[in-house]
């Protein structure tokens, strides 16, 4: 489920979802954002620490922060100007 915080960051809680769902939903959410927008993703899947940074790179976005608290990882992502391989 996603929400928008007071600073305009889209909050996406993917807790409890297993691979590949956190990566797929992160990609979908990033593609729906306007360039320069921020996305905060919370995930508990151990593979999210590998998969989500790869999605961020593939989408031409920037991983601004990664916080871990036990099994919970929180990713702060800024969408780039455009996806590197976007088709017109």
Where are these regions (language model features)?
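C-terminal structural segments of small proteins and small subunits
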Residues: 53-88
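Conserved beta-strand core positions
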Residues: 10, 39, 73-75
């Amino acid at each position: 489920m996603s929400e928008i915080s007071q600073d305009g960051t889209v909050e996406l809680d993917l807790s409890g979802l297993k691979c590949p769902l956190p990566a797929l939903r992160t990609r979908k959410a990033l593609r729906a954002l306007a360039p320069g927008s921020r996305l905060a993703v919370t995930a508990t899947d151990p593979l999210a620490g590998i998969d989500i940074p790869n999605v961020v790179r593939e989408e031409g976005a920037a991983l601004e922060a990664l916080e871990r608290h036990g099994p919970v990882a929180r990713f702060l992502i800024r969408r780039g100007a455009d996806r590197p391989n976007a088709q017109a």
